[in-house]
Amino acid sequence: MNAELERVLDDLLAVKGVLAAAVVDVGGEVLAAAEREPPGFDSAGGLVAAALSASRVLGGFLGGGLEQAVIEYRGGPVVLTPVPRAPGATDPGEVQVVLTLRLAGLADLGRVRFQLPRLVAQVAAASRRSA
């Protein structure tokens, strides 16, 4: 696992309501994972990649790229946010990793969304340095 990405994810766990976080590549490899409360995403890389792929296809069907996917579960929502390979990239082909978060509840979604641009930039920078 990538030590720099793990540090970013550990910082992310300090955000109120974030229970688990991972950075997963489009092939399903977990590049880094951290959790404050199990279950985390250590062994769920393939599932995250499949959810990302399905969300991208649905976005294409609807005529737009995937910005973010939120899937609600009884155990709390999961947020999938594509991380562009290059700053400002908008082409879905430029997405190589996805930031995946498990939240305590829907009430935490607004707080996390407010901080996502900063978090995505940190993940992107750490991903580029490790590539």
Task: Locate the predicted segments by residue.
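Non-catalytic interaction/Regulatory regions outside core domains
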Residues: M1-A20, V26, V30-A131
